[in-house]
Amino acid sequence: MLGRLTGLLAEKSPPQVLIDVGGVGYEVDVPMSSFFNLPAIGEKVTLLTHFVVREDAQVLFGFLTAPERETFRMLIKISGVGPRTALSILSGLTVGDLAQAVTAQDASRLVKVPGIGKKTAERLLLELKGKLGADLGPAIGGKPASDAQADILQALIALGYSEREAQAAVKALPAEVGVSDGIKLALKALAR
């Protein structure tokens, strides 16, 4: 029904945003991966959307990239995975990380996502096997080389940097850098 929205970003309140399209405000739920990459309030934004109509609600879900939306649509087709759970999965893992977990059949990565238990994780791995390509990983952002780099990336995102900026800063760090020193170096690089 609604495939895309282009308008001004009026409000941001995780996980929801308000997009002003020609004087009409659309409330859109977005995964945190998209939320952290949104422009500043008042700037133009385009979101690919998926509209869910239920007996008690009509909810619009938005995504910055087509792979995110397609993955969301794959997830909600799986028994026991509704739109909120799918949004939670895409907030906890990038599409690339999810693809890598599916390829490696790594349920432990999926159970780290809030709301995903062992049985649901195993069902996801079974249902998505062969459907979600591992080749998506590098195209969507890939996986940090180490746990320290993953922690640095999370810290930078928590400080308000976009995922893209944070990934570029982490990529420029020496491989064996610790979390504390890595954050300091990344912040210096981002300040330039």
Curated annotation (Swiss-Prot):
Domain II, as annotated region: 65-139
Record keywords, A-Z: Cytoplasm, DNA damage, DNA recombination, DNA repair, DNA-binding
Region Flexible linker, annotated ranges: 139-143
The keyword DNA-binding is assigned to this record: yes
Coiled-coil ranges (or none): none
Region forming the signal peptide: none
Cellular location(s): Cytoplasm
Region Domain III, annotated ranges: 144-192
Molecular functions (GO terms): ATP binding; four-way junction DNA binding; four-way junction helicase activity
One GO CC term, this protein: cytoplasm
Sequence segments annotated as region (Domain I): 1-64
Transcription regulation among keywords: no
Primary localization class, coarse: cytoplasm
Any one Gene Ontology BP term: DNA repair
Name of one Pfam family that matches: RuvA_N
Highest taxon in the source lineage: Bacteria
InterPro entries: DNA_helicase_Holl-junc_RuvA_I, Hlx-hairpin-Hlx_DNA-bd_motif, NA-bd_OB-fold, RuvA, RuvA_2-like, RuvA_C, RuvA_C_sf
Assembly description: Homotetramer. Forms an RuvA(8)-RuvB(12)-Holliday junction (HJ) complex. HJ DNA is sandwiched between 2 RuvA tetramers; dsDNA enters through RuvA and exits via RuvB. An RuvB hexamer assembles on each DNA strand where it exits the tetramer. Each RuvB hexamer is contacted by two RuvA subunits (via domain III) on 2 adjacent RuvB subunits; this complex drives branch migration. In the full resolvosome a probable DNA-RuvA(4)-RuvB(12)-RuvC(2) complex forms which resolves the HJ.
Family stated for the protein in its record: Belongs to the RuvA family.
Domain comment, as recorded: Has three domains with a flexible linker between the domains II and III and assumes an 'L' shape. Domain III is highly mobile and contacts RuvB.
Known role: The RuvA-RuvB-RuvC complex processes Holliday junction (HJ) DNA during genetic recombination and DNA repair, while the RuvA-RuvB complex plays an important role in the rescue of blocked DNA replication forks via replication fork reversal (RFR). RuvA specifically binds to HJ cruciform DNA, conferring on it an open structure. The RuvB hexamer acts as an ATP-dependent pump, pulling dsDNA into and through the RuvAB complex. HJ branch migration allows RuvC to scan DNA until it finds its consensus sequence, where it cleaves and resolves the cruciform DNA.
NCBIfam families documented for this protein: ruvA
Name of the molecule in the record: Holliday junction branch migration complex subunit RuvA
Provenance organism: Methylibium petroleiphilum (strain ATCC BAA-1232 / LMG 22953 / PM1)
Taxonomic lineage of the native organism: Bacteria, Pseudomonadati, Pseudomonadota, Betaproteobacteria, Burkholderiales
